[in-house]
């Protein structure tokens, strides 16, 4: 019997299954929960429980995603699985489900297919740092040479997208066979393969750096003046820790960042000596005038982030049914880019040979925005027209 409550003492890691349609992502997810449930590390979830993924909205975009959780001896995992290919594209681009690592499911019987390639490309573009391969349906392949061939193909494909193809663990097995058996034993022919997979995930995907250990950053949501005390910027601390007396910078919307010192931290009308990632705070800033800071800028640890105006982005364009545009857009399209808390107008350059982009498409674009924004690779944004979301994107590389 699984413990009702997960102990939160173990390090937490976010993973997800990716891969071509019908290669067995959901079946394998169900098999992981069943096998681990035998060791008290999960509540077994049936295929159809996972498959009927609830719809969620992220940045105005509807995505169907299933979340399961489980634990191994060393870690607690949150695992996402999506029913449809479009859901994966949207999920990865919006960052609705940030992945510290992915389990790439490839059918041994079919080898890599078009969506296998697309998901690897997406993982590279949106910054999924590690991939472990589950070579599913291994029960359907009798020829060891064929298995070897498929494995080579997968390694080449991973290397092509700058993943370390030669080092990535590839674990053969069968989600379906493990589900049908369900004994959960490490010695079992099929359940043991699921344990092999989890051991690889445990050892190959590193524990991510916690948000509090990263350099301080807080998007400015609002600014006001407290008579006799100075200017206060409010917002939710995105990462890191801010202590009273820290030197920080105001970054974005101006050419050069502006240095200041945080002279007070307030939360729920109480004064604190520090705040950390996740806290909603007001930060009192020394020598900053009300007009020197505005929504859309960020407060950040000095030197940790710079303002930029030109970047490439991986973008998903909403379909008409999702409330997006009804018509395609062309080169020099000028929407607003919504970064963190503000809209900035920009101009879009399409890749060579792309005439236009249809609603529902995924595309890599180059953008130039009219005001600099504190930006780094992996930053998510929405594309809007007059306040209506028509696309979602992620910064892939910064040009200037």
From Swiss-Prot:
One Pfam family of this chain: GTP_EFTU_D2
Any single GO CC term annotated in Swiss-Prot or TrEMBL for this entry: cytosol
Family recorded in the similarity comment: Belongs to the TRAFAC class translation factor GTPase superfamily. Classic translation factor GTPase family. EF-Tu/EF-1A subfamily.
Main location: cytoplasm
UniProt catalytic activity: GTP + H2O = GDP + phosphate + H(+)
Binding site for GTP: 19-26, 81-85, 136-139
Subcellular location: Cytoplasm
InterPro entries (alphabetical): EF-Tu_GTP-bd, EF-Tu_GTPase, EFTu-like_2, EFTU_2, G_TR_CS, P-loop_NTPase, Small_GTP-bd, T_Tr_GTP-bd_dom
CDD domains, alphabetized: EF_Tu, EFTU_II, EFTU_III
Subunit note: Monomer.
Binding positions (Mg(2+)): 26
Gene Ontology MF terms: GTP binding; GTPase activity; translation elongation factor activity
Annotated segments matching region G4: 136-139
Protein role: GTP hydrolase that promotes the GTP-dependent binding of aminoacyl-tRNA to the A-site of ribosomes during protein biosynthesis.
Domain tr-type G, residue spans: 10-209
Domain of life the protein comes from: Bacteria
Name this protein carries in UniProt: Elongation factor Tu
Keywords, ordered alphabetically: Cytoplasm, Elongation factor, GTP-binding, Hydrolase, Magnesium, Metal-binding, Nucleotide-binding, Protein biosynthesis
Spans annotated as G5: 174-176
Region (G2): 60-64
Residue ranges of coiled coil: none
């Amino acid at each position: 019997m699984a413990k009702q409550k997960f102990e939160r003492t173990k390090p937490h890691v976010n993973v997800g299954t990716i891969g071509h349609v019908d290669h067995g992502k959901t079946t394998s997810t169900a098999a992981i929960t069943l096998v681990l449930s035998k060791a008290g590390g999960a509540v077994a979830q049936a295929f159809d429980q996972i498959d009927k993924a609830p719809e969620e909205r992220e940045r105005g975009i509807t995505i169907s995603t299933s979340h399961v959780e489980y634990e191994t001896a060393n870690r607690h995992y949150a695992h996402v699985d999506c029913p449809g290919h479009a859901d994966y594209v949207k999920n990865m681009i919006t960052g609705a489900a940030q992945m510290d690592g992915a389990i790439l499911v490839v059918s041994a019987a079919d080898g890599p297919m078009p969506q296998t390639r697309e998901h690897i490309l997406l993982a590279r573009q949106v910054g999924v740092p590690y991939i472990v391969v589950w070579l599913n349906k291994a029960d359907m392949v009798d020829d060891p040479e064929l298995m070897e061939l498929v494995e080579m193909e997968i390694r080449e494909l991973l290397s092509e997208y700058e993943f370390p193809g030669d080092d990535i663990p590839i674990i053969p097995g069968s989600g379906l066979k493990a589900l049908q058996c369900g004994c959960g034993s490490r010695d079992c022919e099929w359940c043991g393969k699921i344990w092999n997979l989890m051991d690889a995930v445990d050892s190959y995907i590193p524990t991510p750096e916690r948000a509090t250990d990263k350099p301080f950053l807080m998007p400015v949501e609002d600014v006001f003046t407290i008579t006799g005390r100075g200017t206060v910027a409010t917002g939710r601390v995105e990462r890191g820790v801010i202590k009273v007396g820290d030197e920080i910078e105001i970054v974005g919307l101006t050419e050069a960042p502006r240095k200041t010192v945080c002279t007070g931290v307030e939360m729920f009308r109480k004064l604190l000596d520090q705040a950390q990632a996740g806290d909603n705070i007001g930060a009192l800033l020394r020598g900053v005038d009300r007009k020197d800071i505005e929504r859309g800028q960020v407060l950040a640890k000095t030197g940790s982030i710079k303002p930029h105006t030109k970047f490439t982005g991986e973008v998903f364009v909403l379909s008409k049914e999702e409330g997006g545009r009804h018509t395609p857009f062309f080169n020099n399209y000028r929407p607003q880019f919504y970064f963190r808390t503000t809209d900035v107008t920009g101009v879009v350059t399409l890749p060579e040979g792309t005439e236009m982009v249809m609603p529902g498409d995924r595309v890599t674009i180059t953008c130039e925005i009219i005001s600099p924004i504190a930006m780094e690779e992996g930053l998510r944004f929405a594309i809007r027209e007059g306040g209506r979301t028509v696309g979602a994107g992620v910064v892939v590389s910064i040009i200037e």
